[in-house]
């Protein structure tokens, strides 16, 4: 029998510390539960075990603590955020049918050793999944350790251990007894490190063998002294480090075969934890009808034909096969392609829908605007909980306990749809988010649908030629690198690149990882002056990314109409920003000359011009308004260059004396303040000492005193409420602020400072998009809104409409809100995006 045994504590710790803090909308921590399930699912998929045991440590002291008071004495307690997840995870595993095992007085390691030995005795094979290298001593021909590392899971068999350490698996106990283990506070022999311990065990076989050969010339005099003086510690360490194989637990492998568990309870718990994709991975059904059916029978409803003259309110949603249905009371109507478009703009009809954007696509394709749509449950769910990873009607119905009124085989989620939309509407009203939905998010969904439908024209031949030139450049750069290093190697292999730079060329290594030398961008940047090869490697990486991600990616996405139709996502960013995918048009490079050339291949259609409008320093203007800082407001009101004005104020010099370097420093501080950067990060950005950066920050905050006060208030209010808000009332939960982990808490504080500003900027550009789109239609123009990138809008307009469109963009973007500091938009035109911006 193939038995998989998980070291529960080791793996749950890796999950907790390896994944950013996640919470449900009601503040329950979930990252460890989420990560542990992914680890378990991946192990099951990769190894298909016959039985699975999950071993846990108990809180009670073990026999090792009794033998040595200092055992694990340096360990910190479990973080509160993880401790809260443990009982939930264990209950979920029980509901999923997994057998868990623990024993007071024994560690999970001993359970792993006991189960592996017992299974081997019956002729079985065992896989031990852990992140703890202590378990490597258990490896033999029948037992393999699946060692979880930061990047991958490494199968460790006897050959792998011999290759890595130069000893057999059981000899690792002997090594530890000499070198000790700081993580478990096992003392070892003071002054004997890993290298020496390995050498001694390789020569003498064991701890006992070392002490039997203390007079051997291979043992240096100082080493001999340490060994003689600390023999008792070494023998104690040997006992502490040896994993026992006789824990008093059930050892029959059959005992650990997975049971049926309680699928309904597991599905319900996963719904409460908002882990909908994992529900699907476990093969569970969490649809409201399925959950309800487990408790009581529901009346079965057969779909009907939509009335020829529909009126009143209907609730619309989409089945998994893409078909649409409507619910009115206890009636379900399947909507075909003939009836659906007319329903979306029908007079006397109000439609509450789940996911409006595809419906707006249909309406626009048929000459309508989806005027009957009055509410979108998906957008409401996003506004209520922007941290969720997915928004599906069936999953949300389970999450919000929206009970189904009936069952319908043709539309499994239909029975709970109206109840779900009711509860989402009520909760959004209670949160004060109704206006945000109706005036911004819902009309924006229509705008995004139109932008997706229209697309952006590109010069495909120009992109192909650009790709050819990049390939030629890459080949030349590659040959230069080979010549500089002296041989050919795989430049995309970090290991081979590290060997070339640090072993062959002799460059000073900056960082080392478990896999070898670090060759990340930061490391290479610090080595530029040592060899021309480094500069070429950085250039090679830049060109390769341009070619694979942008050139080849854009050509793949090109539609038959010669335009690229990106997908705009409204429910992804926690700050409220819109994102773009397939392809991501918001990430087209602009900071480098070569990267910005790509924008030159985004073109206006024949006879048309691109009109590009970009907000000027919108986030700083919001900062000046939101903080009420008179000095900052005055700088904007006077029309000054804000960065130059800031430099003049903090350096106490006339603006005319501000150099480019001083302006750059002021710009870094202006934006650094918003993003919560401290002296260390700012110093790194500016290439100055931490002390100098700290002086800059203090001077800045003295110059703009209300900025610092506002930032501190943001953090305090967020800690009190558990969330921050934009000026439009958009909420972002910040569970990170309650973390006991300093780094996580600091990250939460940075988000508390920045989100009200960045989120308000996102809201402003969204509202501007809605107003611009509507005004173009109201004035019956042929011009069309094509793209939004951060604070920039791009419109494609016929030549005779360009001046009118320029005026519309400027007016609507600048007048969308009325703040103490006016918003300004800079407008340009051109035949390409590069030229227009």
Feature locations, PLM:
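Conserved RNase H-like, two-metal-ion catalytic cores of nucleic-acid enzymes
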Residues: 3-4, 8-53, 69-70, 74-81, ...
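C-terminal polymerase-core module
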Residues: 472-479, 483-534, 702-750, 754-756, ...
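Conserved catalytic core of nucleic-acid polymerases
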Residues: 453, 561, 565-566, 570-573, ...
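Function-dense linear segments that define catalytic or interfacial modules
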Residues: 360, 366, 378-407, 411, ...
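Noncatalytic, basic helical substrate-engagement surface that gates or grips nucleic-acid strands
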Residues: 1-129, 133-155, 159, 233-236, ...
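Active-site-proximal helix-loop-helix substrate-binding element of RNase H-like nuclease domains
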Residues: 152-176, 183, 322-448, 472, ...
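Non-catalytic nucleic-acid-binding/docking modules located in mid-to-C-terminal regions
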Residues: 50-53, 98, 121, 140-144, ...
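Conserved "right-hand" nucleotidyltransferase catalytic core of DNA-directed polymerases
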Residues: 230-338, 347-356, 413-593, 609, ...
């Amino acid at each position: 029998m193939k038995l998989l045994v998980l070291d529960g504590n080791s793996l749950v710790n890796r999950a907790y510390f390896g994944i950013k803090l996640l919470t449900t909308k009601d503040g329950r921590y979930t990252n460890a539960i989420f990560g542990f399930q992914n680890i378990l699912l991946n192990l099951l998929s990769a190894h298909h075990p016959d039985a699975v045991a999950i071993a846990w440590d108990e809180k009670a002291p073990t026999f090792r603590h009794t033998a040595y008071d200092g055992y694990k004495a340096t360990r910190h307690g479990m973080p509160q955020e993880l401790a809260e997840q443990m009982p939930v995870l264990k209950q979920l595993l029980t509901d999923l049918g997994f057998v868990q095992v623990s024993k007071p007085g024994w560690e999970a390691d001993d359970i792993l050793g006991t189960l592996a030995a017992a299974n081997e005795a019956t002729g079985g094979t065992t896989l031990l999944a852990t992140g703890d290298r202590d378990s490597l001593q258990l490896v033999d021909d029948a037992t393999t350790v699946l060692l979880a590392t930061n990047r991958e899971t490494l199968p460790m068999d006897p050959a792998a251990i011999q290759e890595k350490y130069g000893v057999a698996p059981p000899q690792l106990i002997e090594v530890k007894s000499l070198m000790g283990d700081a993580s478990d506070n096992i003392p070892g022999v003071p002054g004997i490190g890993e290298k020496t311990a390995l050498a001694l065990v390789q020569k003498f076989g064991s701890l006992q063998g070392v002490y039997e050969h203390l007079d051997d010339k291979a043992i240096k005099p100082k080493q001999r002294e340490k060994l003689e003086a600390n023999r008792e510690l070494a023998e104690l360490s040997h006992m502490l480090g040896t994993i026992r194989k006789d824990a008093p637990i059930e050892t029959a492998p059959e005992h650990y075969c997975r049971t049926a568990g309680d699928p309904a309870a597991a599905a319900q718990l996963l719904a409460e934890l908002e882990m909908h994709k994992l529900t699907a991975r476990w093969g569970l059904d969490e649809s409201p009808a399925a959950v309800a059916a487990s408790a009581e029978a529901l009346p079965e409803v057969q779909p009907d034909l939509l009335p020829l003259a529909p009126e009143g309110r209907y609730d619309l949603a989409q089945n998994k096969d893409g078909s649409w249905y409507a619910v009115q009371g206890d009636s379900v109507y399947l909507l075909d392609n003939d009836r659906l478009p007319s329903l979306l703009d029908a007079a006397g009809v109000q439609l509450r829908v789940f996911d409006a954007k595809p419906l707006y696509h249909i309406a626009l394709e048929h000459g309508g605007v989806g005027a009957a749509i009055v509410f979108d449950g998906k957008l409401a769910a996003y506004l209520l909980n922007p941290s969720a990873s997915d928004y599906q009607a069936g999953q949300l119905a389970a999450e919000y306990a929206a009970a189904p009124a009936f069952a319908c085989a043709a539309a499994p989620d239909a029975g709970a749809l109206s109840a779900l939309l009711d509860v989402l509407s009520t909760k959004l009203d209670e949160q004060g988010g109704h206006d945000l939905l109706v005036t911004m998010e819902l009309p924006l969904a229509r705008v995004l649908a139109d932008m997706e439908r229209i697309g952006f024209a590109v010069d495909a031949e120009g992109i192909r030629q650009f790709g050819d030139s990049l390939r030629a450049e890459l080949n030349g750069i590659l040959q230069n690198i080979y010549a500089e290093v002296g041989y050919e190697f795989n430049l995309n292999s970090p290991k081979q690149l590290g060997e070339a730079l640090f072993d062959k060329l002799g460059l000073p290594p900056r960082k080392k990882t478990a896999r070898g030398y670090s060759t990340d961008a930061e490391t290479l940047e610090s080595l530029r002056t040592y060899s021309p090869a480094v500069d070429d490697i950085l250039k090679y990486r830049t060109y390769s990314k341009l070619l694979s991600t942008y050139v080849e990616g854009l050509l793949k996405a090109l539609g038959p109409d010669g335009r690229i139709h990106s997908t705009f996502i409204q429910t992804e960013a926690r700050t409220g920003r819109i994102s773009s995918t397939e392809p991501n048009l918001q990430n087209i490079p602009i900071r480098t000359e070569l990267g910005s050339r790509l924008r030159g291949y985004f073109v206006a259609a024949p006879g048309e011009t691109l009109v590009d409008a970009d907000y000027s320093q919108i986030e700083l203007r919001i900062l000046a308004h939101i903080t009420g800082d008179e000095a900052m407001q005055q700088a904007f009101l006077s029309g000054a260059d804000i960065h130059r004005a800031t430099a003049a104020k903090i350096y106490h010099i006339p603006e005319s004396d501000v150099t480019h370097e001083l302006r750059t420093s002021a710009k870094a501080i202006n934006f650094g303040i918003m993003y919560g950067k401290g002296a260390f990060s700012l110093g790194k950005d500016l290439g100055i000492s931490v002390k100098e950066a700290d002086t800059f920050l203090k001077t800045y905050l003295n110059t703009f005193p209300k900025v610092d006060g506002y930032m501190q208030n943001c953090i305090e209010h967020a800690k009190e409420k558990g969330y921050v808000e934009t000026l439009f009332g958009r909420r972002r939960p910040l569970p990170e602020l309650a973390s006991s982990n300093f780094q996580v808490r600091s990250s939460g504080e940075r988000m508390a400072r920045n989100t009200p500003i960045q989120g308000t900027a996102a809201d402003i550009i969204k509202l501007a998009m809605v107003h611009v789109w509507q005004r173009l239609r109201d004035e019956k123009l042929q011009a069309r809104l094509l793209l939004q990138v951060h604070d920039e809008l791009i419109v494609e307009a016929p030549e005779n409409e360009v001046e009118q469109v320029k005026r519309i963009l400027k007016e609507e973007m600048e007048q969308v809100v009325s703040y103490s500091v006016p918003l300004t938009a800079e407008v340009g035109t051109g035949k390409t995006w590069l030229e227009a911006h």
